[in-house]
Amino acid sequence: MKTLTDEKLTIVGAAGMIGSNMAQTAIMMGLTSNICLYDPYAPGLEGVAEELFHCGFEGVNITFTSDIKDALTGAKYIVNSGGAARKAGMTREDLLKGNAAIAEEFGKNVKAYCPDVKHIVVIFNPADITGLITLLYSGLKPSQVTTLAALDSTRLRSELAKHFGVSMDVVENCRTYGGHGEQMAVYASTAKVDGKPLAGMIGTDALTKEQWAEIQTKVTKGGANIIALRGRSSFQSPSYVSIEMIAAAMGGKPFRWPAGAYVSNGKFDHIMMAWETSITKDGVALKEIKGTPEEEAALEKSYKHLCALRDEVIAMGVLPPISEWHALNQNIK
């Protein structure tokens, strides 16, 4: 089987539903011939490895370990789903304290065991914060760390397709920016449905303002809805989309959706947030975001919410004050 690379890809949290699905997706997409599975829960990890062995895949070497040093040593790409899962009634922010500590330890381990890693995708929630913590403690460049932020945009696409009764293929350029959660900024001005600008349909019989507001609510509550329907948090969609991200970083197909990236541009500073980006072998690069005044105001509101979360982490002592970030990671200006 031809693969994008032969370099080592480590899946952190591989015993979980997201991690195990990421591993299978990476193999089926032909990312690399060298996949390492890591999880501190050794029995579950071995079970995942056995299932993958039983798939009979060809051209791939699958290893597994519960030793983080072994898992990260030599890794050039990492996707990390190794945080606590969100349960019914919890918001992403409820997870903040425990997962912030996990992200700090992970970042330090990256710096110790694989400082030459090329790209990391962090997907455990709240990803805007866990990705930021990982970046700071890993010592990596901002271009080398991204977070999963695309599911809100894919959910917008899905809801619009359902509303208009059309294939998702004709719903284009759906975008949400800012926070990966209930405080996201949902953009209408970028989207088209069957070639028609979405913004021009809002307030008409085709899509009343009330219906548009309902769609936005469904998008912002999409993750909670999956929990209500399935009794557990999403795993198929985050697995697939996060592997699409790391594939782009390996030189594969361009990533089609917004990604969480470190932003510090004078208007939005010292934060990880969903942004319009490109992901290539050179890492993640920021693009310009254009929206209506209302959309830009929503993005600023989302940014302030993320800043409050960031400042809470600083108050917890997980991160130092912003003025000391450069001393922690010299790639942060």
Model-derived segments and their meaning:
Residues 138-143, 153-333:
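C-terminal substrate-binding/catalytic lobe of Rossmann-fold NAD(P)-dependent dehydrogenases
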Residues 6, 31-75, 84, 311-318:
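Conserved N-terminal Rossmann-fold NAD(P) cofactor-binding segment
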Residues 55-119:
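Rossmann-like NAD(P)-binding element
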Residues 28-34, 139-142:
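Conserved S-adenosyl-L-methionine
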